[in-house]
Every structure is written in structure tokens, then in C-alpha cells.
Amino acid sequence: MTISFANKVAIVTGAGGGLGRAHALYLAKLGAKVVVNDLGGALDGSGGNSEAAEKVVAEIKAAGGTAIANGASVSDDAGVAHLVKQTMDAFGRIDVLIANAGILRDKSFGKMELKDFEAVVNVHLMGTVKPAKAVWEIMKAQGYGRIVVTTSSTGLYGNFGQTNYGAAKMSLIGFMSSLKLEGAK
């Protein structure tokens, strides 16, 4: 069986490196037009520009694929609106959203500031919810759409110094478990 994403458009968040980059490259290899989203900051979410996303786009284009870069924050309403508008303006549809963006601010809970807890939950959870909400009606109107979320065993089993990350990742499991039921209707 041959898998093809020809004529499909995929947004991959957090695609400037790691799993997101791998997802973007593979989807492009299978024929998808890919929107490579990455804020390009440090692992803790500080700093950033679209350079990381642009490098992945260059890799995709060098291999004969089609891609555009987006450096917006997926935890920001205006950033998500720009991401979706840029995708629709460039390609006219959105078939796949891979919500992979994330940051780390590891510290034991007793030493962690609430702002660091909130920042991680905001990027992982709301940085998934906001893009999913933004593409939901587009996908429904098309009669096709797939939303894939990156989670972690830390959400189920925990990991020292990652209460924020574990809470965010477990919440994604609940979010997707409910969303898949709604999407099936």
C-alpha cells in the first residue's frame, strides 16, 4: 500500500527541529504541501524568529517539495490567525494539523514559579487548542481533516521536575479523546 498526501496541505507546529521537523519532512516526502511553523526560540520559549522554520522549508524545497515558513506563536490568538490565513492564502485548504509545539521549563515543583508552570501549559495545551479551533470549521467544511497531537509518557507517569509539562501533556490526552468523538459526528 502506497501512502500519498498529494494535494493535501499540512500545518506542523514546532517544526523547526526534533519531532516536528521529522513530521514536516516526511509529510513533504509523501507529497503534502507543508506549512512549517516554529517560533524559533530556545527550549524555554525565550527569544525566537522564523529562521528554524525557514531552514526546514529549504530542506523540503531542496528535496523537491513545497513548503512555506511561519514564525508565529501558536499560543497567541493573532499568531494563530496569521498562521491559518497564510496557509489558506497560499494553498486554499488545510487537511492536516500536527500540533507539536512545546517548551520546557523544568524545575522541581517547590522551586518552580507559577509563571513557568503557566507558560508551559499555555504553549502545550493552548498552543494545541487554538490552532485546532482555528482549523476545525475549515476541515468540517472540506469534509476532511486530521488533527494529530504530540504528547508524552510524562503525562501518564510523571517525571521529576516536570509537573508543568506532565500536566500539559495529560491534558492533551483528554482534549484529543473528546475531540475525536466530536469529529466523528
Please give the residue ranges for each predicted region:
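Residue(s) in the substrate-gating loop at a strand-loop-helix junction
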Residues: 152
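Canonical Rossmann dinucleotide-binding motif of NAD(H)/NADP(H)-dependent dehydrogenases/reductases
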Residues: 3-36
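Substrate-binding pocket helix/loop in short-chain dehydrogenase/reductase
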Residues: 60, 108-109, 113-121
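Active-site loop immediately N-terminal to the catalytic Tyr-X3-Lys motif
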Residues: 110, 157-164
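Active-site helix of classical SDR
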Residues: 20, 132, 168
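A glycine-rich helix->loop->beta "capping" turn
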Residues: 63-66, 86-99, 105, 144
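A short, exposed helix-loop element centered on a Lys and neighboring polar residues
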Residues: 132-133, 177
